[in-house]
């Protein structure tokens, strides 16, 4: 189950953080200031979780900004404050472009990067090539929308990213997961209440089986 359902998240967490386990929990949904939903039709695939977000939004509209990154106009996208309808398969470029803008605006968390990360220079060299104009054209979105979402990562506190099979079930899924985690590491949006990269499991016990060592290479 874990190998078929969300193996990209497994590999992405392990490569980026050294351990296969989301550094977030469901309670973070109640405390995030920004919820970025990428590659997930949460309204239909995780309805209980999505209703939890909407109830909070309805109770205090200014407390939460919902961003949806999805080529499709899903029910999830219809409820978003910002919908980035990127061209299919371009979300890794989008994440690199957002990281580029965080760096350009000096929005990186220098202290966090120095204390808790490594290989910053190679990452810097990659994302600096993904300029806003290049990314906007590649993804098929307005450049202003790209800038608006990138600003949320360094101008707002408590950014929580959530994804599921739209990211995981693809050839470059692990790279996209790492790109998202890198964006959180760059901006220091991790390891604090209401912030972090949060993979949503697609099937029952996809996480529990891994926690119990139920993967072939761990037996």
Model segments located where?
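Short, intrinsically disordered, charge-balanced linker/junction segments flanking boundaries
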Residues: 212-219
